Amino acid sequence: MITMHIGFDDTDSPKMGCTTYVAALLVVKLHQIGASFTDYPNLIRLNPNVPWKTRGNGALCLRIRCNEELVEEIMETTIDTVEKNADLSYAGTDPGIVFFFNNIPDELRTFAKRTIQGIVKMKEALKLVKMFGAEAVGFKNGRGIIGGLAAIGETLEKDHTYEVITYRTPKNRGTPRRIQASSIREMNEKTLPLTFNNVDPETDRILITPRGPDPILYGIRGENPKAVKQAHEIVHSQEPIERWVIFRTNHGTDAHLRRINSISEIQPFNPVVVQGDLAKEPEVIPGGHVIFTIKDENGKVDCAAYEPTGTLRKVAKKLIAGDLIEAYGGVRQASSKHPVTINLEKIRILKLAPKISFFNPKCPHCSKRMKSMGKEKGFRCDKCGFRSSKLKKVAVKNKRVLKKGLYITSQRSQRHLTKPILRYGREKANAPKKMIVNWHFP
């Protein structure tokens, strides 16, 4: 028996397809050939800020054991399944497959981390493929080889979550999804906090169903396989489910965010965590988006809390100059219309600056609030006529509404990788030792 890791990526397009669906098909096909799975299919979300991603930027890895004589058939089946289900007609879809037969080396783990947190080049992936005797297959420019190799290298031995994904029958794809909304809300109430991001609490919007033409009916995310399977069993679908699979994933783990020491280290397209003081008061621009600038001793950068971020936007609006914060988010490159900007996913307030208001002094004779006679000309009292050029405005410290702590964008606008509040304190430190029995259908 040999161990085999099969990584693949970039099969979908905005019009159709889903790389997880290719994985779901292969789960059944590889079982039929005689392979046994050593892990749930791994769904690895890569850097969400790369400009060439299709939709969710998710790569897949299937980890199996099989007899050596089955390897060729498994490889042929994988290549055929990817080719038949990828949208090769779309200009931005460039599928890639990697077959890896060794234990996962540190070099590959490092490559995976860099692919999740930054930008890597094809030549780096191909160098590793050659170095470790892997085999790679690319369609068109084969960019999916990068994601496929990264999915193999990310073994999810630290924090991870699970997602059960259900798929529609071919005849229903492209039509409105038919699921009983009340059953989703019931599922949410019964399974929280072991599942997360099912229903947006601010708007009551259902979050488990995608809106595009892809084959997914719904996906439920949670802390363990039993929780997501139980949640799936509560949901009442009003259309047939073709198949479903439980994936192990880096969803909701903040795996993409990399802490940097200085604003000067910021690079376009990289997700970062960086500390800085507010340089000036936040500005609300057309559309309701809130923009503010943070600075440190080495530079400054704009931060944007867009209108859909909900709670985060409201928090950003209440910040003042001098507040010390950590900004979490992806870096948008500069353009002719705006500078380099961090698109915010989270804000951690570390220190609140005092908010000071200045008032005219009260008259020392009659206690009425005095009026200014002009810049540096002193004050006069309209009631008793007293005047003074020596009195100064009185500083009053106002109570801040904001509190120190972590603030996260509303659930409806959280990215796949963003760790929600519910998950703090639930981080995992090890991969699972065994799998549940029925983790896919058929």
Report residues per predicted region.
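Long, hydrophobic alpha/beta structural blocks
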Residues: I74, T78-N261
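OB-fold nucleic-acid-binding modules
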Residues: E233-K280, P286, V315, R348-K355
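Short nucleic-acid-contacting surface segments enriched for D/E, G, S/T with interspersed K/R
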Residues: G310-E326
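OB-fold/S1-family single-stranded nucleic acid-binding modules
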Residues: R332-N360
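Short cysteine-rich clusters marking metal-coordination/redox-active sites
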Residues: C363-C366, C381-C384
